[in-house]
């Protein structure tokens, strides 16, 4: 199972995301990196795989495209959610894998080719449609994505942990490559995700609190 380092960008800084309450996000300068500078942050931690959410572009207030491309040069793969709104609204660059999120991607996901679909979930429902996440993943079987990410926004930054029964339903609903992010708190949660059959775990807070070893993020894999 891949281990992917998550980080959010806002106002040219890496910020600590929590529950999707973006107005309150603060610079992440207390964890494994002494700097919240986007490129410096990646150089300090040296992950193999990186997930970036460009909050300014998702909200339509700015862009970190230059910083993202620089960060992508430093990793094997950089999964990027920058608020894609149409098939021609993708970022082209070395090592970049575009993410199309349900929050901004519109209602017709059949028009996209390639990239990853992020099933953005708040309060157990896909946003903005309000659909059941497992049902939505079943629909994604018919679309032309490389894989899917189940992003539990309500749990981001909380270390609430994962629910094995819910994870099993999600995994059973989609046969393709499937990552999970949001609330992963420790090695036990990673074991649950791996045993359930998830292909990747996107983590941040657990790493910065020391619950997951930094060298695991640097090698990019978890083996239970």
Residue ranges and their predicted role:
Residues 21-42:
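Short catalytic helix/loop segments, enriched in acidic residues and glycine
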Residues 3-26, 88-156:
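Conserved anion-binding
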Residues 38-94, 164-166:
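N-terminal active-site wall of soluble small-molecule enzyme domains
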Residues 63-68, 129-138, 160-168:
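Charged helix-capping and loop-helix junction motifs
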Residues 68-75, 109-110, 167-173, 194, ...:
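Surface-exposed amphipathic alpha-helices with a cationic face
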Residues 83-109, 152-157, 182-216:
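Glycine-rich phosphate-binding active-site loops on the catalytic face of alpha/beta enzymes
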Residues 139-179:
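Active-site/ligand-binding-proximal alpha/beta "capping" segment
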Residues 2, 67, 72-81, 95-96, ...:
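Short beta-strand/loop segments at the ligand-binding rim of alpha/beta enzyme cores
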